């Protein structure tokens, strides 16, 4: 069990590590060569240029020669606090702003309660002496005397703990209500203030019935013209284009090589670039690089055009899914919230995600298999949770060396060394647990994808839910149970079964020492590592040296990342759980929790402003999950305290806690009915008000033209019609120029993107793909440098969307 000395060693190690990370970040961020790594958000919005261009000296292009900036290396902290919440919403979206509010909620809940608990409960716990009399039977440390374990059984002092639990519950519920209300208002205001966006007018229809003699588009068109004649506008069929998407990815690679050799030739016109045609360009016939890749692209485009025509013509590749658009938000909201058919399993409608939020691959999953998939994944997650009990038990064995010493005395020569003992108990357990948890979010996201959800935001929320249950069962309950077993192994083996509940009741509060070490590793050093961005830094420079060939490649190499909701939100909920549970049990843990919330808020604020570029905008759809799991933490805390008092034989005071879970559940039920509907559906009142305002300001608005291809698969995004390859070079050129429109969105707007200019805003450009053969265009680009980039940059869009369907 970790002692005060062990906690001190762990604190020094983690504080020193965090300090080193912050110093390294402060120095690396001001170097010109690293500017794209630490400020990619501003490059994507077009508001920042590389400082290397303005410095004329060779050394100055790589190293910051202004010595004054090294004395203000901590100025990133006040800079991160300057941007207001409304500015963050405009800059990074509502999801990012609401995510930051989780940290401020933690500070608001725990700061006043920490003062109360430290002033009231710590003196009460210390003044008792139960552990002094039990130290021969149990493994205890000085820090455990600050916990409820040190209070004597049947003591009247337990009324103080019950009073603090009541005060904390009422305060937490008050803050949760205020925050839920504020977030709901922010969401509705954000939706009301948005420009026209395709998801506001569109629903996704699944399980379209197969009508003999009718195609899916005809069936959908006829059904909605019949049942929604006043508001139905158009629809977009969905194709299984996963095979074609792979071809798009391969073609993009060829395009990048072609761009690279064209640029290389422009820089040195007197030398013709060449390459070998063999494996990895290491052997084979040496050929003209530009002509070789131009021919490769021409042949590839021919194959892609054939595949595209196959996708559009083959009825087997047309899915029983459609995106149906209406001429008003009200019409779309009514359709999404009502049953469309007397058979409730057909014509299933729901509000459409925004176009960049769609996970296209899962649209091809048959609806009938979704239930089976969810059942299989549910069983798999259950098995995974219990499989991970093994490494959790191993971690707890490291944290409880005294318990092992009594059973295995041969370990004493190693564990008696002070530094080894402090390192093993104070630092290593938290680090080991962090390592074991590292790969889990990715595994759980893959499981969520298998379940068949069609929106990335939903996938991440489902993965986050799985990760939370995992953290609850394994990290919290598993660490307590396994830790208590290892800690008091000698007692369990040498005492009567009737004494085991008393031992558990005394030992559970002592696990706060393990969680303190975990908080310092994950919440202090881990958060400092987040701002350092060591992995993206190394990868960027490796790509810059070996892979980057064009400016487009350099933009891709920046990899700004995004707030990983599937990992960060469950981790946050674990911190809430620890703080809530240990407030009345071991309040000494609260200062460590508060330091985490304050430091993490500062770091993530900086990252959201300067680094992250979100994949999608869900308008804070994750908040009901955050609220619900904090309520669950309150219930766990109350039940745990009841169990502890029962094990302490506090028969007079324990019944006073029975009413608390009932009040908490009643509060949760009220909030669920009061606020959650606004996060599930678009209110008809809001939709109608927005429609009326729009009709008054733009009475001649043509919505059909804007919504026609808003939900076309990204690789078919510019148009949906068959294209015949022309053998004439001039014909090819005309076809390309006519059928490859470039859909641009204002790059200075950083809210959720949309592929339709009139309907959305974006933080980066969206470009459209043309599946016709552009061979003549490549020749023109090769000969006329002024026109080459107009086409070449179009391939970037496919790779942005590739991860969604591949």
UniProtKB/Swiss-Prot annotation:
Regions of compositional bias (Low complexity) in chain numbering: 775-786
Region feature Disordered, mapped onto this chain: 726-786
Ranges that cross the membrane: 7-27, 102-122, 157-177, 375-395, 427-447, 467-487, 512-532, 576-596, 626-646, 650-670
Lineage: Eukaryota, Viridiplantae, Streptophyta, Embryophyta, Tracheophyta
Key words of the record: Calcium, Cell membrane, Golgi apparatus, Ion channel, Ion transport, Membrane, Phosphoprotein, Transmembrane, Transmembrane helix, Transport
Listed name of the protein: Hyperosmolality-gated Ca2+ permeable channel 1.8
Primary residence: Golgi
Molecular function per GO: calcium-activated cation channel activity; mechanosensitive monoatomic ion channel activity
Family that this chain belongs to: Belongs to the CSC1 (TC 1.A.17) family.
Composition skew (Polar residues), residue ranges: 751-762
Subcellular location: Golgi apparatus membrane; Cell membrane
InterPro entries hit by this protein: Csc1-like, CSC1/OSCA1-like_7TM, CSC1/OSCA1-like_cyt, Csc1/OSCA1-like_N
Encoding gene per record: OSCA1.8
Matching Pfam families: PHM7_cyt, RSN1_7TM, RSN1_TM
Modified residues (Phosphothreonine): 735
Record GO cellular component, one term: plasma membrane
Function summary: Acts as an osmosensitive calcium-permeable cation channel.
PANTHER family attached to this UniProt entry: PROBABLE MEMBRANE PROTEIN DUF221-RELATED, TO DEHYDRATION PROTEIN, PUTATIVE, EXPRESSED-RELATED
Comp. bias regions, Basic and acidic residues: 731-750
Gene source species: Arabidopsis thaliana
């Amino acid at each position: 069990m970790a002692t005060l000395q062990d906690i001190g060693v762990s604190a020094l190690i983690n504080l020193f590590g965090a300090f080193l990370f912050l110093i390294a970040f402060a120095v690396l961020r001001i170097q010109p060569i690293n500017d794209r790594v630490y400020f990619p958000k501003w490059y994507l919005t077009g508001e920042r240029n590389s400082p290397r261009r303005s410095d004329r000296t060779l050394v100055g292009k790589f190293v910051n020669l202004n010595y004054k900036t090294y004395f203000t290396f901590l100025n990133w902290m006040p800079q991160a606090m300057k941007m207001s919440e409304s500015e963050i919403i405009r800059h990074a979206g509502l999801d990012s702003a609401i995510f930051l509010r989780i940290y401020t909620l933690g500070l608001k809940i725990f700061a006043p309660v920490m003062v109360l608990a430290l002033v009231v409960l710590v003196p009460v716990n210390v003044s008792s002496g139960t552990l002094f009399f039990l130290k021969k039977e149990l493994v205890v440390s000085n820090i455990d005397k600050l916990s409820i374990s040190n209070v004597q059984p049947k003591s009247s002092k337990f009324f103080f703990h019950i009073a603090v639990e009541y005060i904390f519950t009422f305060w937490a519920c008050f803050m949760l209500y205020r925050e839920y209300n504020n977030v709901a208002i922010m969401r509705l205001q954000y939706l009301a203030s948005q420009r026209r966006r395709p998801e506001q007018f569109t629903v996704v229809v699944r399980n379209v019935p197969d009508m003999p003699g009718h195609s899916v588009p005809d069936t959908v068109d006829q059904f909605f013209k019949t049942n929604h004649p006043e508001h139905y506008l158009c629809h977009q069929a969905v194709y299984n284009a996963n095979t074609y998407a792979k071809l798009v990815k391969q073609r993009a690679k060829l395009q990048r090589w072609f761009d690279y050799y064209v640029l290389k030739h422009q820089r040195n016109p007197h030398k013709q670039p060449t390459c070998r045609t063999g494996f990895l360009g290491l052997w084979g016939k040496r050929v003209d690089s530009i002509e070789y890749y131009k021919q490769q692209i021409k042949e590839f485009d021919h194959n892609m055009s054939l595949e595209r025509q196959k996708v559009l013509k083959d009825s087997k590749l047309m899915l029983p899914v459609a995106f149906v658009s209406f001429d008003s938000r009200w019409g779309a909201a009514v359709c999404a919230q009502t049953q469309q058919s007397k058979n409730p399993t057909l014509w299933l409608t729901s509000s459409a995600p925004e176009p960049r939020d769609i996970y296209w691959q899962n649209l091809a999953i048959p609806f009938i298999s979704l239930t089976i998939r969810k059942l299989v994944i549910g069983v798999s997650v259950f098995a995974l949770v219990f499989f991970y009990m093994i490494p959790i038990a191993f971690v707890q064995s490291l944290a409880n060396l005294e318990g092992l010493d009594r059973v295995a005395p041969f370990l004493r020569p190693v564990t008696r060394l002070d530094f080894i003992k402090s390192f093993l108990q104070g630092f290593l357990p938290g680090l080991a647990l962090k390592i074991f948890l590292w790969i889990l979010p990715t595994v759980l996201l893959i499981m969520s994808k298998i379940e068949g959800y069609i929106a990335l935001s939903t996938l991440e929320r489902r993965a986050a839910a799985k990760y939370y249950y995992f953290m609850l069962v394994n990290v919290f309950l598993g660490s307590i149970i396994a830790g208590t077993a290892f800690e008091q192994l000698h007692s369990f083996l040498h005492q009567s079964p009737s004494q085991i509940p008393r031992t558990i009741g005394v030992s559970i509060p002592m696990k706060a020492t393990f969680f303190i070490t975990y908080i310092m590793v994950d919440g202090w050093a881990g958060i400092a590592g987040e701002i350092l961005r060591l992995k993206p830094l190394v990868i960027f420079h490796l790509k810059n040296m070996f892979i980057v060939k064009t400016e487009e490649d350099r933009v891709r190499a920046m990899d700004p990342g995004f707030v990983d909701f599937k990992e960060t939100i469950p981790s946050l909920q674990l911190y809430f759980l620890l703080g809530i549970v240990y407030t009345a049990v071991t309040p000494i843990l609260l200062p460590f929790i508060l330091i985490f919330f304050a430091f993490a808020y500062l770091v993530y604020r900086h990252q959201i402003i300067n680094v992250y570029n979100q994949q999608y905008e869900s308008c804070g759809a994750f908040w009901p999950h955050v609220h619900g799991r904090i309520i669950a933490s309150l219930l766990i805390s109350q039940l745990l305290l009841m169990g502890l008092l029962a094990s302490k034989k506090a028969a007079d005071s324990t019944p006073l806690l029975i009413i608390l879970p009932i009040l908490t559940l009643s509060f949760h039920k009220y909030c669920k009915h009061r606020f959650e509907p606004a996060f599930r559906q678009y209110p008809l009142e809001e939709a109608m008000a927005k429609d009326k305002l729009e009709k008054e300001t733009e009475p001649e608005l043509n919505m059909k033209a804007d919504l026609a291809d808003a939900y076309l698969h990204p690789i078919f995004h510019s148009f949906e019609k068959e294209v015949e390859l022309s053998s004439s070079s001039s014909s090819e050129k005309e076809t390309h120029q006519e059928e490859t429109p470039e859909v641009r969105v204002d790059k200075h707007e950083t809210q959720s993107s949309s592929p339709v200019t009139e309907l959305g805003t974006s933080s980066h450009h969206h470009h459209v793909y043309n599946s016709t053969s552009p061979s003549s265009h490549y020749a023109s680009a090769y000969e006329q440098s002024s026109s080459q980039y107009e086409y070449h940059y179009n391939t970037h869009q496919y790779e942005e969307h590739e991860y969604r369907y591949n």
